[in-house]
Amino acid sequence: MMNELFGEFLGTLILILLGNGVVAGVVLPKTKSNSSGWIVITMGWGIAVAVAVFVSGKLSPAHLNPAVTIGVALKGGLPWASVLPYILAQFAGAMLGQILVWLQFKPHYEAEENAGNILATFSTGPAIKDTVSNLISEILGTFVLVLTIFALGLYDFQAGIGTFAVGTLIVGIGLSLGGTTGYALNPARDLGPRIMHSILPIPNKGDGDWSYAWIPVVGPVIGAALAVLVFSLF
């Protein structure tokens, strides 16, 4: 169990370091990649997921996402006694990963005066605030993610091919469905860094938009549960 928890911790740390790292590079001022756009962000997140799964996959199932962990447990693939430890490890990894992003980009955070840009490097936020629409966006994106992960398990791939497929899937979801909310798809990916946003001493950071914070937590869990329901028909 300890190896599995370390794998979930380390994989989620790398996921956030690389994923929110690319967001910081695009959004924060005076970086070499400043203003390179949404396509760069989606590509970066796809690579982040693939690298994180490669690194952690020999230690744990590489869920790196509480919604995936809950979905696997609902499907009968993980004992419920393991769910909370997995999720705690994922949150710990996400929070430490975000600290490393902050350390990497510290001078650029200090040069940023826009609170919204700072928050965007920590957590997701909607392009247009609409509770129902935003929730549906997170449900749909996570439904596609988890259903496809389950479906990939039906095929025999050479080692590593499935991981590349998941990375490509993240890019696809981001390009197709992610532009409305920033596509969290993962409670740890959003809430863990959002907590760190409240803690870290960053000038001009503003608040953490906590009125929105429940959507990237609840939406992915609902999406994962729906994916389990649909996959049961396969």
Curated annotation (Swiss-Prot):
It catalyses: glycerol(in) = glycerol(out). A motif (NPA 2) lies at residues 186-188. It is found in: Cell membrane. Its main location: membrane. A motif (NPA 1) lies at residues 65-67. GO terms for molecular function: glycerol channel activity. InterPro entries: Aquaporin-like, MIP, MIP/Aquaporin, MIP_CS. GO terms for cellular component: plasma membrane. It comes from the Bacteria. The chain crosses the membrane at residues 9-29, 37-57, 61-81, 83-103, 135-155, 159-179, 214-234. Keywords: Cell membrane, Membrane, Repeat, Transmembrane, Transmembrane helix, Transport. GO terms for biological process: glycerol transmembrane transport. Gene3D superfamilies: Glycerol uptake facilitator protein. PROSITE patterns: MIP. SUPFAM superfamilies: Aquaporin-like. It is a multi-pass membrane protein. Mediates glycerol diffusion across the cytoplasmic membrane via a pore-type mechanism. Aquaporins contain two tandem repeats each containing three membrane-spanning domains and a pore-forming loop with the signature motif Asn-Pro-Ala (NPA). Belongs to the MIP/aquaporin (TC 1.A.8) family. This is Glycerol uptake facilitator protein. It comes from Streptococcus pneumoniae (strain ATCC BAA-255 / R6). The gene is glpF.
